[in-house]
Amino acid sequence: VKGVVVKLSEATSYLNPYAEMQVKNALVAGLKVSAYHYSHFTSKEEAREEARYFVAAAKRMNLPKSTLMVNDIEEYVTRNNINENMKAWEDEMRKLGFSNLIHYTAASWLDNNSLRILGPIETGKFGISNFWIAQYPYDTMHVTQAMSMSLHSSSAAWQFTSKGTLLTN
């Protein structure tokens, strides 16, 4: 493990009460810290508001502007005008000084995927390398199996399971 992605905020009404401790503990352990925001925005203005809320949370944690900031976009209500709203979120994040940005979503939400499903997100507007993609091809899969598949190899990251354990000494 080289780093962690800590949930800081959700919509404009939730702050992770454990985030400060999680960030501190990760830094003490020598891990790289990234942060994510769980989005609910349905308009450009809401996207900008959520970006401001996320940045305020990051500043409270003293996260540097170079921190990888993740827009977790998977709520069904966000699908209308999703591309324009995601762009508004990105623009506001950059305006506030945070430009190391990616989006987390399910493979089925992307227009470019291996599922033969046309998702609402136009990857060409953002670049496939700016997506952390969740797709679970098998109920159980080990890291070595996932690495041999090379699924989503051009994306920022591929999440191949929702279950996992960390080995300890």
PLM region descriptions:
Residues S13-P17, T42-A47, V77-I82, L110-P120, ...:
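Extracytoplasmic/secreted cell-surface and envelope-processing proteins
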Residues L8, T105, Q135:
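Residues that line or immediately flank small-molecule/substrate-binding pockets and catalytic motifs
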Residues V1, G119-N169:
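Functionally critical loop-and-helix segments that line ligand-binding/catalytic clefts
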Residues K2-S99:
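Substrate-binding cleft of extracellular glycoside hydrolase catalytic domains
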Residues H37-H40, H103, H142, H152:
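Histidine (H) residue identity feature
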Residues F98-N112:
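Aromatic-lined carbohydrate-recognition surfaces of secreted/lumenal glycan-active proteins
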